[in-house]
């Protein structure tokens, strides 16, 4: 039990696909015992580049690939998913030494060998080029159509996102990381209050509002040291998005994007500037590509609550 580090150095974020199988394998082994944690450190100079819609798509795909691959367990139980944090050198401003004094294990790509020399750990294991070549060939990936404005710079500074954030899982982590990437100046997260959760499935297994807010705040500070964030309780579908003039971007998922139109309309009524809307596709690329060797679980808060309900019934 303890903390495990996967240190990968990439020339491009789209190379994350090469590491899917090895991450799944490591996560599966770690899931056998409770108390393990997994950190994935990505060293990629693309994170130093100016923010564009193209880089947004690259980052989104990389996060989905890494987090979905980590949601692999030995017993196919969502409750066994190993807590995982993806960090980016040149963006997170996190020092590896601040996470732990000694790592249980460090897995590293061959090109990162010089960078892991001073990392204290009980064991080291290289995941070299010949291993990676057997996993995936990046050239075989389907290419996403690039729009004409893919190179357009993103200037948003204050981002907002809303949700239940119950039993914080890998999908939430993708959403929150991207919201943090957009919110250079400030990140505002609206967490649904009890009055918005009356129709939730297995609602008796929902975490309380304080727990959900704490988990969101802790996660945001764990991925970016200098982040400026506000985590607030929302009592209606809008929250601060229709009252705060400084918010300039709204991050939504496929499940919540219908609410973005209502937010825009309400802001116009109140004389507030319209927001940039960014929709996160949490299914790409691991599920979209239907990779045969990717055994990641389909994670959702509802599925976690249903599993907790079954466990509670079994233990009666």
UniProtKB/Swiss-Prot annotation:
On the tree of life, the source organism's domain of life is Eukaryota
One GO BP on record is: coenzyme A biosynthetic process
Residue runs in coiled coils: none
A Pfam match: CTP_transf_like
Gene Ontology cellular component terms for the protein in this record? cytosol; nucleus
A Gene Ontology molecular-function term?
Answer: dephospho-CoA kinase activity
Gene3D superfamilies in the record: HUPs
What NCBIfam families does its record include? Answer: PRK00777.1
To which protein family does this belong? To yeast YGR277c.
Q: Could you identify this protein by its name?
A: Uncharacterized protein C1F12.08
